[in-house]
Regions:
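Extracellular adhesion/carbohydrate-recognition regions
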Residues: 1-55, 87-91, 98-102, 115-124, ...
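C-terminal, surface-exposed recognition/capping segments
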Residues: 60-130
């Protein structure tokens, strides 16, 4: 597999942990597997659980980059034993009072949904230092 400078496998201590995405000033790793085995949870519960576990998920900009490089990201996930992006995933970005953005990987689009509805979560590790 040809690896480009934007999308590449990411390893920690020799173990594949996700896909690194480096675009402009964004540098992040999409986890190899869904958070909590892909359980669908309401947005506020998801954000609380991520906070408690010292984790995060896509911001809006990162979700846009994921959408742009969707096929390459899924190829790296599959080639290294990860799970493809194949669900609706919450982002950490609220749209308005009761709505938050989500990344619908089934249709490769970004939308928003009511916070009390349920979606899956895929964690992100930010590598960019402020």
């Amino acid at each position: 597999m040809e690896i480009n400078e934007i999308i590449s496998p990411y390893f920690e201590n020799g173990v594949f942990t996700g896909v690194r995405v480096t675009v402009g000033d964004e540098d992040f790793v999409i986890a190899a597997k869904d958070y909590q085995d892909g359980e669908e949870i309401p947005w506020y519960d998801a954000m609380d659980a991520l906070y408690d576990d010292d984790l995060t998920t896509w911001n809006y900009r990162q979700a846009c980059f994921t959408m742009a490089y969707f096929e390459d990201i899924n190829r790296v996930l599959v080639d290294n034993g990860g799970d493809t992006l194949d669900k609706c995933y919450w982002t950490c970005t609220e749209h308005s009072g009761n709505y938050s953005f989500l990344y619908d990987s089934k249709h490769n689009l970004i939308g928003y949904y009511v916070n009390f509805s349920t979606c899956s979560v895929r964690t992100i590790k930010n590598l960019k230092t402020e």
